[in-house]
Amino acid sequence: MLHGIDVPSNVRHDNTLARPLRDWGPKERVDVIVTNPPFGGMEEDGIEANYPAEFRTRETADLFLVLLMKVLKPGGRAGLVLPDGTLFGEGVKTRIKEALLTECNLHTIVRLPNGVFNPYTSIRTNLLFFSKGTPTKEVWYYEHPYPAGAKSYNKTKPIRIEEFEAEKKWWGKPDKAGYYSKRQESEVAWRVSIDAIKSGNYNLDLKNPNRTDEGPGDVEHLLPEYEKLLEQIAQTRARLREELHQALSATSRGTS
């Protein structure tokens, strides 16, 4: 599992988020981060206090995104998996996305199709790629299609690395400032300016304007939308639960 390393000496079991963000010093910053942070879960009480007030949340994926921005060196690059909920989420998520697009160049979002992590979760996911040090001017989107004849992924027919050859050919090289201005739009690729993203309150869950939508009765189209609605409801409930928990904790401290 660890590429033939029988006894890894530099791997430890711990909660990275338990360390206060301010304690990560310049010597610990890195050039490249590739990660699939846990998502869909909530951190234990008190973990959020390790982060600045404007970013405090108990949602694991959100805190990891804040941590990544901290530990990347200037000019460093990151690629990570995040759920749709991060893209369309509001409140703390909006503030985190605003910081990301201000401090980093979020140049590419690869929108993965439904079922990539089946059977473990049906949550739709995305691949985000950014570099630190220059602000975002535009975000390129690439809608990863199913292979010919497929309508979903599963444990016996998972997504394969060979399917990303099209993205690799399209990717291209950035200019000296780190922007991908020479990329071409297509049926699966499009760009959105930072002004448009700001006017949409940093909602990054943007549809492909170049694709003809399926009919309203298409199950393969409706199911992901239904699942997204369920995720939005779950996030709202989690946010309300967290606010209620904080209010009760404050009341308890005030009466003790």
Label every model-predicted segment.
Residues 1-6:
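Short, conserved SAM-binding/catalytic segment
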Residues 13, 18-256:
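A conserved structural/catalytic subdomain of Rossmann-like adenosyl-cofactor enzymes
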